[in-house]
């Protein structure tokens, strides 16, 4: 069953791996933190598998097997380096701008496990804060995805019922979040998330380019 396009009033986007490709800058920042701790570096593909669960989870996995267990300090180091290298190589995925702007008749929001301040900095630097009616980051609430509390908050804020909401993301975490909130879900296959896990999460839609949302929801 497909959502009735006229009924959809709120589109909720994940950030990393959905709207922007941040992998290179995240990888460099993780490795700078690891270097400062005199630990081995990790490849981009390894770190790619760690993105999506928030900074604490990212560094917890990056430290796995090293014997170093001060995750809080590692997160502090990562945050410092990432703040310095946030926009070195980060860029929008193809067709992101035009697709989000196409849905200007709906509410467009971001719901990510990334700290909200980093999201805001990237959007402002890329001159694309204006289309989004709200930004929820991993530190905006006491919970993070896949907990659906953020979606519940957004539905209350914009006076939407679940059938009026579409959650778009590149990971199984995003799809699980949407399903737990009872909203429509759309997976994007071009992002950073594990493609097999994304498929197995069984989103209502699966697209290989964000612009395909326009045809799905026309």
Where do the protein language model's features map onto the residues?
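Asp-based, Mg2+/Mn2+-dependent phosphohydrolase catalytic module
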Residues: 1-9, 45, 120-218
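Active-site neighborhood of HAD-like aspartate-dependent phosphohydrolases
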Residues: 2-49
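Short, acidic loop-to-helix structural element flanking the phosphoryl-transfer center
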Residues: 7, 84-110, 116-120, 148
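An amphipathic alpha-helix signature
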Residues: 27, 31, 44, 48, ...
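Helix-loop "lid/cap" segments that line or gate small-molecule binding pockets
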Residues: 33-34, 54-68, 122, 154-155
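Short helix-capping segments at alpha-helix termini
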Residues: 35-40, 66-69, 127-131, 159-160
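Metal-dependent phosphoesterase signature
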Residues: 60-101
